[in-house]
Amino acid sequence: WQQHITIDPDTHEPLDYRSNVEDFLGKTMRFLNQLEPENGLFKELDSRFTRAMELAIQLLPSGGFRLPSLPGKKRPINMAFFESFSYLLSRLNGEGKQFHRQVQNTYMQLMCNDAYLDSLTRSVDSGKQTYKRYEIINRLIHELNLC
């Protein structure tokens, strides 16, 4: 969606998020299920997703997709955080200790960013909050300059 590669299977126009996560997810899955494994886009998406998950496992603390909580409390995985931070990881190209430190610092920045945290906890599925979340993520991607 952020890269403008998904196509709405009903309208054949670029898919846009309109505050209805069920509809958006359904259309995205229909689009993805139409791709053949030999398709270049399929291969690229598979590669990006795999790398993002490998980076998450390697660099994030245990429970890394959970929002901060009080000691002794364990919050569930936050899906909006999972999707947006995974998107950030999927866009980065880099290796080595310095790159890993940059990713970990970015993670910590986000955990202290009130606007980002608000977008993960209030009206999470609204278009306004979704766009705000990805605006913050895209700005960080640009600042990291590792694409």
What kind of region is each of these model predictions?
Residues 1-147:
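Flexible coil/loop and intrinsically disordered segments
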